[in-house]
């Protein structure tokens, strides 16, 4: 900890307070996340430290870099590269009646997919993607933050400040209690974020797990074993769910063209193995007119 100077508190993350800091030797400005763990007495579980140390290997232009893992008494500090703006703040700053430039929506979505594909190829899931942990700089670059923390520390029901963790971006298989899930959970989250980039409004903004499910069902239809094999045997599926018919995504997400709606539809397929993968999504015609050579990861092969 002696290498870093805390400058100011900049926010409250899922796991604890986030500070802006500076490396005393190099002068690099950093974000320092203090991880508050449930069982303070026992100190930091070694499994969590191992998990987190692996994340230092995730180096990609669209993934926020974990620079250092520090222990101080029973507290764990994660030191990340610093970016001052997140996607939620940016969307909130767009004046009423105005929307994000469609080319920027496309560029951001493509970069998010690049970052997620890089991590998925290394068998790391995010599990908790949302606009608050997508960070942006002033050069049009977007980066995914908090990768792998869900696996190391679990996804709490409430933030340590007792604020409820948002369900808006959570995949239906997770909401329905599936014990095993994989990379498609992140693709679902990115789909809901894609819609929000276009409209500035969350696509499914439920205030409880059942409300969240019903908002999804009202738009996409209530799933059954026909459209999603074995969904009816998931722990939290009830045969008493109202049977909504599939609606029309295009009427809900008005600012996307035909290709955009087609890609969004494929990202929001109920059956996880049928849901488009990040790699497949990147070759979708929606991105045909995007100049990928200007993107930060353009020279990388995944």
From Swiss-Prot:
Known regulation of activity: Phosphorylation at Thr-14 or Tyr-15 inactivates the enzyme, while phosphorylation at Thr-161 activates it.
Q: What keywords are assigned to this protein? A: ATP-binding, Cell cycle, Cell division, Cytoplasm, Cytoskeleton, Kinase, Mitosis, Nucleotide-binding, Nucleus, Phosphoprotein, Serine/threonine-protein kinase, Transferase
In this chain, ATP is annotated as bound at 10-18, 33
Q: Which residues does this entry mark as bearing Phosphothreonine?
A: 14, 161
Spell out the reaction equation it catalyses.
L-seryl-[protein] + ATP = O-phospho-L-seryl-[protein] + ADP + H(+); L-threonyl-[protein] + ATP = O-phospho-L-threonyl-[protein] + ADP + H(+); [DNA-directed RNA polymerase] + ATP = phospho-[DNA-directed RNA polymerase] + ADP + H(+)
Q: Which residues carry this modification: Phosphotyrosine?
A: 15
User: Which GO BP annotation is one of this protein's?
Assistant: mitotic G2 DNA damage checkpoint signaling
Give the enzyme's EC designation.
Answer: 2.7.11.22, 2.7.11.23
List, alphabetically, the GO terms of the cellular component aspect: centrosome; cytoplasm; nucleus
Q: Where is the Protein kinase domain?
A: 4-287
Superkingdom in the source lineage: Eukaryota
Which organism encodes this protein?
Carassius auratus
PROSITE patterns named among the record's database cross-references: PROTEIN_KINASE_ATP, PROTEIN_KINASE_DOM, PROTEIN_KINASE_ST
Task: Provide the top EC class.
Answer: transferase
Question: What InterPro entries does the entry give?
Answer: CDK, Kinase-like_dom_sf, Prot_kinase_dom, Protein_kinase_ATP_BS, Ser/Thr_kinase_AS
* Record bears the keyword Membrane: no
Question: After translation, how is this protein modified?
Answer: Phosphorylation at Tyr-15 by wee1 and wee2 inhibits the protein kinase activity and acts negative regulator of entry into mitosis (G2 to M transition).
Assembly with partners or alone? Forms a stable but non-covalent complex with cyclin B in mature oocytes.
GO MF annotations for this entry? Answer: ATP binding; cyclin-dependent protein serine/threonine kinase activity; protein serine kinase activity; RNA polymerase II CTD heptapeptide repeat kinase activity
Name of the gene = cdk1
Q: Does the keyword DNA-binding apply?
A: no
One Pfam family, please name it: Pkinase
Active site annotation, chain numbering: 128
Biological function? Plays a key role in the control of the eukaryotic cell cycle by modulating the centrosome cycle as well as mitotic onset; promotes G2-M transition via association with multiple interphase cyclins. During G2 and early mitosis, CDC25A/B/C-mediated dephosphorylation activates CDK1/cyclin complexes which phosphorylate several substrates that trigger at least centrosome separation, Golgi dynamics, nuclear envelope breakdown and chromosome condensation.
Compartments reported by the entry:
Nucleus; Cytoplasm, Cytoskeleton, Microtubule organizing center, Centrosome
What family does the database annotate? Belongs to the protein kinase superfamily. CMGC Ser/Thr protein kinase family. CDC2/CDKX subfamily.
Protein name as catalogued: Cyclin-dependent kinase 1
